[in-house]
Amino acid sequence: MSSSGQNRNSGSGNPISNLSAGLKQVNLNDQQQNEVNLNLLQQQLQNETNNPKSQSRITHFFQNQPSEGYTLFSHRSAPNGFKVAIILSELNLNFNTIFLDFNNGEQRAPEFVTINPNARVPALIDHQNENTSIWESGAIILYLVSKYLKENGECPLWSDNLIEQSQIASWLFFQTSGHAPMIGQALHFRYFHSCSVPSAVERYTDEVRRVYGVLEMALAERREALIMDLDVDNAAAYSAGTTPLSQSRYFDYPVWLIGDRATVADLSFVPWNNVVDRIGINLKNEFPEVYKWTKHMMRRQAVIRALRGD
């Protein structure tokens, strides 16, 4: 088990430290949508249990689970797995990462399917809570921050206020339902589809740009409000339009989607923002507020550790 706030990973082959580089090697959609035969899986599980020589490392893990901390099941090219790792790292929680080998079908191992019937990553096991398993990145994140709040009375990435919780959750669900899937589809049709479908590439890339337009507007409004609040001496000139906001000393100051600090609403976007250049979107030129926001988050030590897979 790793020390507090750090991650010790387990995976086959040499680790890929850069998420974007990992995407070049593995198909995002190799998190297969295969039909699961539960009876067959149960039989396979029984056979492996009765034959120790044939046991995979996944079987071995489930038969020898740790008694504390968390285990995150991820993949070197899966942004959603890194998204969960960022939250675990930010909250300084003990966790171990197992990077599944899709080439060997580890995501379809019977034991893994028992904790994630969708046979995809990420999935998380909380060993201090009766080995509770959670799957889907949004559900995992909500579990982590809710538990942290309950145990500590406050959570730096969440809120104890119901209204603010709903606002944070709205952006989190926007990321999981609109942002990530559209980038994933754009990547698929650009690099991995069996034949060229320019209309699909265009459709999904345009939708990603629309999503970033929503973020850009929200962050720009936050930027304007912050400048008007802090740069009091020049507020009248900004309001009159005689002085552009870009001249304010607060123009590059960090702003967040909700409140005055980074929350899961912000951090959930980081891994996907880190690979969006691969579909031809230049955040710095096209969405400058999103770019600045992302760069501020990418400088956080917890984010750096998580994206490295440390």
Task: Set out the residue ranges of the language-model regions.
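Residue-level recognition of oxygen-bearing side chains
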Residues: A139, E289, A302
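C-terminal helix/juxtamembrane-tail motif
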Residues: Q301-D310
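Active-site-flanking alpha-helical
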Residues: V145, W272-N273, H296, L307
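Proline- and acidic/polar-enriched loop/turn elements at helix boundaries
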Residues: F99-L100, P288, G309-D310
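Residue-level signal for nonpolar/aromatic packing positions in well-ordered secondary structure
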Residues: L124, I140, I168, L215, ...
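GST-like fold's C-terminal all-alpha helical module
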Residues: L172-K295
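GST-like domain detector, emphasizing the conserved glutathione-binding G-site
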Residues: S2-N14, N18, G22-A200
